């Protein structure tokens, strides 16, 4: 079996419906992640993401995938960077997390930065291959999950809470 299949064929562990795993690139979307964290906390939901995982002693990818398995819902927030690539699979960590969440049967809620949003050059994928992969990933999220666009931090937080109001008890 391939590296990706190895990650998604194991049976999912018991999940907590009030735990939400938030996946995105870090440098360009840290303020957006913080706004989601605050909104979830105000609703009594637990935010799980790379912030708490990076400090664990095990391999970050394995830790991340374990946290996704325990979450009740997976949220993808995608801007204009494909992000760091996992050497074992060739996928960005955000896309790898998405593939794992789908493989585990998690509800997926996806948000994409609107094309009208102004971004700094540092927030863009500089490599052509990364940008093409980003566009393909965005298309997958739109097609398979009806991804919703956002224009800024506050807009994203509102739309996340609206979407979760329909899917989290």
Language model region names:
Residues 1-14, 114-169:
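C-terminal interaction surface of TIR/SEFIR-family domains
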Residues 2-77, 102-104:
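Conserved N-terminal substructure of TIR/SEFIR domains
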Residues 27-29, 55, 81-84, 116-118:
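Short acidic, S/G/P-rich loop/turn micro-motifs used as interaction or catalytic elements
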Residues 36, 64, 94-97, 133, ...:
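A general structural detector for well-ordered alpha-helical segments in enzyme core domains, enriched
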Residues 47, 106-108, 147:
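Hydrophobic anchor at the start of a short beta-strand
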Residues 50, 77, 111-113, 150:
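Generic beta-sheet signal
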Residues 55-60, 80-104:
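Conserved TIR/SEFIR loop-to-helix hotspot centered on a Trp-containing motif
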Residues 103-116:
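A short helix->loop->beta-strand "cap" motif at the edges of active sites that frequently abuts
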């Amino acid at each position: 079996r391939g590296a990706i299949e190895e990650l998604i064929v194991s049976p999912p562990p018991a999940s907590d419906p009030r735990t939400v795993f938030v996946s995105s690139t870090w440098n360009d979307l840290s303020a957006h992640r913080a706004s989601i964290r605050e909104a979830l906390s105000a609703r009594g939901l637990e935010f799980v993401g790379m912030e708490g995982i990076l400090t664990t002693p095990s391999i970050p990818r394995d830790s991340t995938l374990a946290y996704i398995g325990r979450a009740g819902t997976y949220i993808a927030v995608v801007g204009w960077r494909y992000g760091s690539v996992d050497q074992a699979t060739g996928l960005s960590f955000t896309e790898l997390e998405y593939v794992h969440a789908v493989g585990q049967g998690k509800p997926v809620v996806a948000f994409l930065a609107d094309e009208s949003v102004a971004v700094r050059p540092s927030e863009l994928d500089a490599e052509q291959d990364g940008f093409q992969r980003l566009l393909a990933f965005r298309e997958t999220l739109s097609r398979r999950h009806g991804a919703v666009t956002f224009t800024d931090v506050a807009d994203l937080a509102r739309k996340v809470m609206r979407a979760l109001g329909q899917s989290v008890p």
